[in-house]
Amino acid sequence: MNAYTSDMDFHGGSKLSKITYPLKTIYNSEARKKIRLVLDDFKPDVCHINNFNYQLTPSIILEIQKWRKEGNPCQIVFTAHDYQLVCPNHMCKNPNTGENCEKCLGGHFLNCTKGKCIHGSTAKSFIGTMEANFWKLNGAYKYIDTMICCSEFLKTKMDTNPLFAKKTIAMHNFVDEVEWKDAKKKDYVLYFGRFSKEKGIDTLLKVCKELSDVQFIFAGAGPLENEINGIPNIKNVGFQTGDSLETLIREARFSIYPSEWYENCPFSVMESQMYGTPVLGAKIGGIPELIIEGQTGELFESGNEEELKNKIDKLWSNKSLAEKYSANCKENKFDNVETYVNKLMKIYRGEN
């Protein structure tokens, strides 16, 4: 990123930078000039861009288009990892109310300012509104040839913009292949991920307290860590990676993904099944696309405490069912890097 634009400190910085940053997050002339140097030097057939808002800004798209018009054929491909192009706070969730929100969909970006949706700040939210409206009116996004969405759910939200609907395709992220092992399951249910409200931790903790006979292991970190500690049937092992995390996943009866926001393509849901552990996932965002309900796991209504409790009890009490789901995980195939690259190459060649 710093190869194309100066480092931007959004939380500190000088008095001058606090004045210039808001403008630079909307249109970055420095990034535009530097991307031109790369284009002239490298002469790409494809420019594949990812998270460009606020630092590189869509100004780079204008420069790529200008370069194309000068006789340089080049596809512009964009991978959407979040809702940034249709929601200025990129999550479709109001951080003040905690509610999922679609008010900005369709280009109604003033709702971001009304809801103080960026860091709870009217000023920052207004800048986000300005940025979204500027590029809506400028029309830079029309120069993107293909928009890759990492879930069907994300695609439906992007498609609320008629311009995007002509360009979007859904393609889940890839995962590294792992060796299948018939691990010996142990008597615990696993949650691994961030300990935060949008991840559904509040709801899960209430259920854990009611299911005192079920042993839970939580692996992760986050702002709600203190609320986890002290619940007798929860063992908090902290943030885990590598072999230790793999072992925790493989040996769990099942894992839980109780998210309460519009997750796109959560790696944890795929990772759990890759290691032979079924998933009890919230029916929200792209999560249902990754679980074969009734085969590699179960789904429950996001935020529904009673349904989550019943589903946990069902899978905990019926050990043979959980074992059946575990065996089925072997058949739930996700794209590996080779498959993903082959799909990308078809897009690059314009065969999608």
Regions found by a protein language model. Name each.
Residues T296, E307, K314, L321-D335, ...:
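A short, well-ordered alpha-helix in the C-terminal region of glycosyltransferases
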Residues I234, G294-E301, K314-L315:
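A short acidic/histidine/glycine-rich donor-binding loop in glycosyltransferase catalytic cores
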Residues L85, E102-W180:
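Donor nucleotide-sugar binding/catalytic pocket of nucleotide-sugar-dependent glycosyltransferases
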Residues I148, V175, K181-K199, L205-K209, ...:
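Conserved donor-binding/catalytic core segment of Leloir-type glycosyltransferases
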Residues E227, M270, I284-G294, E298-L299:
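Short acidic/histidine- and often glycine-rich active-site loop of Leloir-type glycosyltransferases
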Residues R250-N264, T277:
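Acidic donor-binding loop of glycosyltransferase active sites
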